[in-house]
Amino acid sequence: MPTPLFHSIASWFLKKRIHQMEHFIKFPIEVQQQVLQNLLYCTTQTEIGKRHEFSSIATYETFKNRVPVVTYEEIADDIERCRKGTQNIFWSTPIKWFAKSSGTTNAKSKFIPVSNEALEECHYKAGKDMLSLYFNNNENSQLFTGKCLRLAGSK
């Protein structure tokens, strides 16, 4: 069982994230532009990045005009190649994992490539953000001092 010291350190660490979240709220457009630029930079040399010339995209407008919205079926062959081990299709670092959808269309599950960066910056960070918001709104919480039940995943 976690100690009070662990609880204090964990809650302090999680509360620090609130300042970043407040920055996102104050500057949503700038933050989104920065995220887009980072994603474009990281994918410039991928098959998709070369196909749509990500290296010459500097604005959201250019991205919107150059990169079409596609259905899963339109990229299914690329995803299947990725599942079989071909790298550098969608992302510049190795894809080792795939999220599996519940199959809401065509009654088939879909596989979504998941990079290590996606795990860190989306999946894991979302959990940390929820805890950060919880501690920010419940300053006297003793969440880490007792037992807890965690549920996760799909089939």
Residue ranges and their predicted role:
Residues 1-100, 106-155:
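Nucleotide 5′-phosphate-binding alpha/beta core
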